[in-house]
């Protein structure tokens, strides 16, 4: 039942305008122009007629207005304008760099006046580190030169410490110890052979 009622409503809608007076029909047509009328107006009308109130009310005059050049539309800058922008940007960057460099120099001058030479302190720290590395290299050379001798060096970070003997020393000592221990190794080797003889007898 509902779909039939809807169809009846749809067919009954266009009927009333035929009962209106021809004057009212003309007024309605003027207020609501058809697309064909709008097309004709757009071809032959002047800008003043395009902005007429009845087209504003209809809302279709927007299509006509959109054909005009919109003052708010984005227009890309020309090559000359782009070059000017780039040059001004580069100049501002160079000015900023110069200002920063001059500010740093001023700060360094003030710090030197106050007695805080930063650069000199950094150089001294680097020299101290190089001296420590040189002293460590000398210690390693000295330990290699004294083969097998335990040498004590100056205090380290945690206190006095002894460097273990280098690898060259124990090999020499170990070779002599192995020669001394060889007969001792042979003796225990002979001991298991002695009980091995009575086992087959038992």
Curated annotation (Swiss-Prot):
Main location: cytoplasm
Subcellular location: Cytoplasm
Stored InterPro entries: PPP1R1A/B/C
Span list, region Disordered: 1-202
Pfam families per the UniProt record, alphabetical: DARPP-32
Highest rank taxon of the organism: Eukaryota
Biased composition (Acidic residues): 119-136
Residues that bear Phosphothreonine: 34, 75
Biased composition regions of type Polar residues, renumbered to the chain: 89-100
GO molecular function: molecular function inhibitor activity; protein phosphatase inhibitor activity
Feature: compositional bias, Basic and acidic residues: 41-63, 109-118, 191-202
Modified residues (N-acetylmethionine): 1
Post-translational modification: Dopamine- and cyclic AMP-regulated neuronal phosphoprotein.
Gene Ontology cellular component list: axon cytoplasm; cytoplasm; dendrite cytoplasm; neuronal cell body
GO biological process, one term: intracellular signal transduction
Keywords: Acetylation, Cytoplasm, Phosphoprotein, Protein phosphatase inhibitor
Phosphoserine, modified sites: 45-46, 102, 135
Entry function: Inhibitor of protein-phosphatase 1.
PANTHER family: PROTEIN PHOSPHATASE 1 REGULATORY SUBUNIT 1B (PTHR15417:SF2), PROTEIN PHOSPHATASE INHIBITOR AND DOPAMINE- AND CAMP-REGULATED NEURONAL PHOSPHOPROTEIN (PTHR15417)
Recorded family membership: Belongs to the protein phosphatase inhibitor 1 family.
Listed name of the protein: Protein phosphatase 1 regulatory subunit 1B
Organism field: Bos taurus (Bovine)
Gene name of the encoded protein: PPP1R1B
């Amino acid at each position: 039942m509902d779909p039939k009622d809807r169809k009846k409503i749809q067919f009954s809608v266009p009927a009333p305008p035929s009962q209106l007076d021809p004057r009212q029909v003309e007024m309605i047509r003027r207020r609501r122009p058809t697309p064909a009328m709008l097309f004709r107006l757009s071809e032959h009308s002047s800008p003043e007629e395009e902005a007429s109130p009845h087209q504003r009310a209809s809302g279709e005059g927007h299509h006509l207005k959109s054909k005009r050049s919109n003052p708010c539309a984005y227009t890309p800058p020309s090559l000359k304008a782009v070059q000017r922008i780039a040059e001004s940007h580069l100049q501002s960057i160079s000015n900023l760099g110069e200002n920063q460099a001059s500010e740093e120099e001023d700060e360094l001058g003030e710090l030197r006046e106050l007695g805080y030479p930063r650069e000199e302190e950094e150089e001294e720290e680097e020299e101290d580190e190089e001296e420590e590395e040189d002293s460590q290299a000398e210690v390693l050379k000295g330990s290699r030169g004294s083969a097998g001798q335990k040498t004590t060096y100056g205090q380290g970070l945690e206190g006095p410490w002894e460097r273990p003997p280098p690898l060259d020393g124990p090999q020499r000592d170990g070779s002599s110890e192995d020669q001394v221990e060889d007969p001792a190794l042979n003796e225990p080797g002979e001991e298991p052979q002695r009980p091995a003889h009575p086992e087959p007898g038992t």
